[in-house]
Amino acid sequence: MMEQVLSFWFERHSPDQWWAKDPAFDEAIRTEFGALHASAALGELYEWRVAPEGRLAEIIVLDQFSRNLYREDPRAFACDGMALALAQEAVRIGADRAVSLERRRFFYMPYEHSESRRIHEIAVTLFGSLDDPESLKYELQHKVIIDRFGRYPHRNKALSRPSTAEEIAFLKTPNSSF
């Protein structure tokens, strides 16, 4: 099944689809991988971790698919801690270096999704290692928000967190959410 995840993400779909809010794409993920996501959230895909590509597939399921399956819902972020821990372990053992540059950035996305300033310091280094100015630019945009607010204000509504006046004003500006 890990091969199907990687094929779906990297071969059958494009970056334009990865980053767009597309109900049809979200439904394709729900139909093909909804049950798999539930298993991943329970830690049941641990056998995938024997290979770098398997680790990557598990991280994509937890980090990326969660956002597509549960838009505007707290469950979109419920697996972030697990995805980050898996990504940190993958980086620690060098699994991120065993895949192509295009795929490698998905080992780093859980760092970008973190609401920790310390984690974003590491993320800048990781994304900088890709020799991909666009990926680094997006990480830096995320980091600016975390440095300023200590969290992503655009998640507040989904997570039932109160927004400060400064966050409300910020959310009215361009590029305030992703």
Segments predicted by a language model, with ranges:
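Intrinsically disordered, low-complexity activation-like regions
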Residues: 1-56, 61-178
